[in-house]
Amino acid sequence: MSAEAEERFATLYGTTLRYTVQGEGSPVIVMHGWGCTAETVSSISRIAVNAGKRVYTVDFPGFGKSPEPAETWGVEEYTCLIESLAKHEQIEKPILVGHSFGGRVGIVYASRNKTDRMILIDAAGIKPKRTLSYYVKVYTFKASKRVLRLIYGEERSRQMIERRRCRAGSSDYASASPRMRMILSKVVNEDLRHLMPKVNAPTLLIWGTADTATPISDAKIMERLIPDAGLVAINGAGHYSFLDSPGIFEAAFTNFLKAQI
């Protein structure tokens, strides 16, 4: 974050949240993706500050300087935390900015709270349709767990299963603690399509066409389901479109922030 950012810690929703505050103007809450921190999205926060906004950038619990939740949270609990932050900071009708996992929280928040507008960047929220090979792997994996326990016992089988899971799973999963692995497994299986029609805030979708984590097809579904949504597709950019194509991203982001809605 920039030198002007003030670091704050608050006990909210039963946990400690670290976040930064900078700038003056209408409030913007910036939410990072899974495995990232407030620093990952610092360039987004800077753009919002330069557009004349007061920007709150969070470290979600389990990332950066915010400790892990004591329980296995889902998107609901992370959203309740952001609702608590808004109340704590006396933020009314914020502008929400969410990248990847942060987009999940933004969708849930905006579906039930007054929101000035929302920007979703390569956002998660659409549960992908699984291929037959996926289900074969899942059920083979579940069956193999039972066999391994019978042959090797509980402790050794647990270690073997964990190694296999890390090799087969996503890098996000492999690099996470046991608690955060359980949370990741929970949140990635949450489909938010049923909430999207309830989002009343004008919404800008900014997406990389080469995003393989949350493909552009997800953006098109969101554009269709969110009543007042528009899509800016950045050709050739990946899951971090704001880093891959910073110039195009900043132009689209700033124009939407400054637009009279």
Regions picked out by a protein language model, each given a short descriptive name:
Residues 223-240:
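Catalytic histidine neighborhood in serine/cysteine hydrolases
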Residues 237-250:
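Catalytic histidine-centered segment of alpha/beta-hydrolase-like enzymes
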Residues 20-65:
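Conserved HGGG/HGGXW glycine-rich cap/lid loop of the alpha/beta-hydrolase fold
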